[in-house]
């Protein structure tokens, strides 16, 4: 909708979902990828060096859940705006659970899904398209279903271009009403406190966080990535994940080349302190079961003390 085949796009990549954004763009235009090792913070100077007045679009995943890192949307947005480039941000795992300032960050298009921090059923997505970028849309060059001009016209009529997924939209409406009831500020604060408590708990267990932060990148407030310790890495990780599942708790492993190296735990949605403490206890007990020393009591105490 925003590029032709010979247009230039800069994709910022430091995880699986940034890489996916890059691969999507490569099907439609010329792409310059500014890539960093997964889990490492973004060097905004490197991004600034890659973006020029010829750049049409800059893409960024704000909350990279493959690594548990919150990327610097504000700083990258300023770079895009300095060159009059459109700024497209993947906000899938932060919108509804963390701050997302579209105007202040110069965001032109934001993307999210229902099933992440909004805590709605999977299957429904949403785009926010800024008025300033609407005039740049060219639906004729987009796949038929993804013609944003068409979607915008239908949205003005409170419709979708094709048959609406009414049950999913109603589910999303209920989830949004729950957010309204809690209050957006309170919800963001809760996610931040819960993620901080979980990180403290992992360190109390004797574990090491995976993401590397700097002055403009920070830990994700909706998901934590943790290094698997010796004795539960690589092929040995299967026994750990089985021990967690046997206790009725669901966590995720690393994606792509990080499989067997890390595990990931989400605190998106409507978790309680008791649920978070149960998750920490389960992780500690699972490590102990497979022969890894973890101070389960200290981990649970860290969560309960922080969130008391």
Task: Tell what function each PLM region has.
Residues 2-56:
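PLP-dependent aminotransferase-like
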Residues 42-96:
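Active-site phosphate-binding strand-loop segment of PLP-dependent enzymes
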Residues 103-115:
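Conserved active-site segment immediately N-terminal to the catalytic lysine
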Residues 115-204, 308:
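Active-site C-terminal subdomain of aminotransferase-like
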Residues 208-243:
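Conserved PLP-binding catalytic core of the aspartate aminotransferase-like
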Residues 247-264:
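Conserved PLP cofactor-binding pocket of PLP-dependent enzymes
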Residues 261-308:
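PLP-dependent enzyme catalytic core of the Aspartate aminotransferase-like
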């Amino acid at each position: 909708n925003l590029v032709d085949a010979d247009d230039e796009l800069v994709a910022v990549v430091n995880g699986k979902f940034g890489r996916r954004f890059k691969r999507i763009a490569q099907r439609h235009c010329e792409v310059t990828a500014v890539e960093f090792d997964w889990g490492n913070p973004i060097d905004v100077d490197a991004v600034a060096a890659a973006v020029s007045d010829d750049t049409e679009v800059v893409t960024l995943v704000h909350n990279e859940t493959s690594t548990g890192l919150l990327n610097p949307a504000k700083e990258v947005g300023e770079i895009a705006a300095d060159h009059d480039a459109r700024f497209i941000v993947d906000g899938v795992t932060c919108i509804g659970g963390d701050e997302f300032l579209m105007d202040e960050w110069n965001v032109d298009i934001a993307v999210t899904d229902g099933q992440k921090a909004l805590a709605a059923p999977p299957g429904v997505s949403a785009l926010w398209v800024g008025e300033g970028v609407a005039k740049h849309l060219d639906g004729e060059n987009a796949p038929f279903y993804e013609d944003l001009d068409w979607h915008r016209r239908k949205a003005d009529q409170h419709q979708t271009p094709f048959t609406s997924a009414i049950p999913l939209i109603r589910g999303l409406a209920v989830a949004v009403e729950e957010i309204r009831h809690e209050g957006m500020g309170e919800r963001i604060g809760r996610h931040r406190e819960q993620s901080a408590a979980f990180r403290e708990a992992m360190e109390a267990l004797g574990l090491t966080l995976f993401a590397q932060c700097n002055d403009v990148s920070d830990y994700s407030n909706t998901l934590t990535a943790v290094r698997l310790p010796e004795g539960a890495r690589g092929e040995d990780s299967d026994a750990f994940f089985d021990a967690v599942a046997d206790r009725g708790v669901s966590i995720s492993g690393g994606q792509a080349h990080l499989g067997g190296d890390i595990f990931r735990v989400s605190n998106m949605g409507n978790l309680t302190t008791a649920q978070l403490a149960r998750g920490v206890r389960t992780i500690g007990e699972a490590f102990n079961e497979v022969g890894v020393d973890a101070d389960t009591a200290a981990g649970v105490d860290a969560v309960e003390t922080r969130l008391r």
